[in-house]
Amino acid sequence: QIKGPSLQEWAHEGVLANMDDVAKAEHWDELLPKVVSDIMKYQGHYIAAPVNVHRVNWLWANPEVFQKAGAKLPTNWDEFFVAAEALKKAGVIPVAHGGQNWQDFTTFESVALGVGGPDFYKKALVQLDPATLKSATMEKVLTTFKKVKDYTDKNAPGRDWNLATAMVINGQAGMQLMGDWAKGEFLAAGKVPGKDFVCVAAPGTAKAYTFNVDSFAMFKLKDGPNQQAQKDLAAAIMGPQFQEVFNLNKGSIPVRLNMPMDKFDDCAKTSTKDFVDTSKSGALLPSIAHGMAVPSAAEGAIKDAVSQFWNTDKMTAKDAMDKIAAAAKMH
């Protein structure tokens, strides 16, 4: 299982099998948004089969806790802090967070998208444009991101993401910024979407979508029967049956467009609608926090800089910008 820019790195080494004949026979170009199929290709040839789509920019909330606190679900960051204040006054932890660098980075990604918008996100966190990384918008993103920390609890450092989700499930906390793998925790606890928990786009990101697509690449093999088995597997992975069963179990959605969604829950239906809409509007964007947007060396360095800022009280947003801009040069 290789994904994102790592696919290009492996393909460059010449070890991945070309899947063009399967892709052509199965019409992958028509069944996938271009931004996704481009990631599955190297020099114009398919080298991977996409399995699913996880949406990263979600906010999960406990509606009962919100109601008791007299708070309303936020649609932008100003409203987020108003809700957080109300939750804090009601004696609950406003934001369930696990202080691990990838969770900090996941939060940062949603703040960057919500404060800066899709074009800013693309320039700063996909193209790593130096001017955008040091812009006034980036400073506002970092200031907003750091403010979120004020509404997390002191036991957050080192906490696993699923334990943070459990805090929202049991009413200890009001909300969590996390990708749609969090949904599996709610469902496993017997909770019903729209009733016991709510899934809304992270503040300010309703018209945008950061994706994390898992994919399978096949290594080049010499043997005919094995090559055929690889092709059959690739075709099956993109087939409607696998796409439905796999994603119903994983909490993600089918990557294949125009799939019937009647067996899926409301969160998945929203995710699919937004996936299709943003693929047309240009706001379907690769997740930097989940290995989809930039080479792994740059991702790791930026992630470390973001966490350092989150964890260092004395560091200013300007210092963090310099560190992130320097980190972006790591290729």
Each PLM stretch: what is its role?
Residues K3-N57, F81, T107-E109:
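Hinge/lid segment of periplasmic solute-binding proteins
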Residues W10-N18, H45, V92, G114-V115, ...:
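Ligand-binding "clamshell"
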Residues D20-P33, K72, G99, V115-K140, ...:
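Short, solvent-exposed loop/beta-turn-alpha elements that line the ligand-binding surface or hinge
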Residues W28-E64, I93-P94, V198-A208, L284-H290:
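A structural signal for short loop-to-beta-strand junctions that line the ligand-binding cleft
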Residues Q43-V51, N57, F81-P130, A173:
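Extracytoplasmic/periplasmic solute-binding protein
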Residues E64, K68-A69, T143, D150, ...:
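Extracytoplasmic/periplasmic substrate-recognition and gating elements
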Residues A84, V126-P157:
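Glycine-centered hinge/linker elements that transmit conformational signals in sensory
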Residues M259, T272-A328:
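C-terminal capping/gating helix-and-loop segments adjacent to ligand/active sites or protein-protein/ligand interfaces
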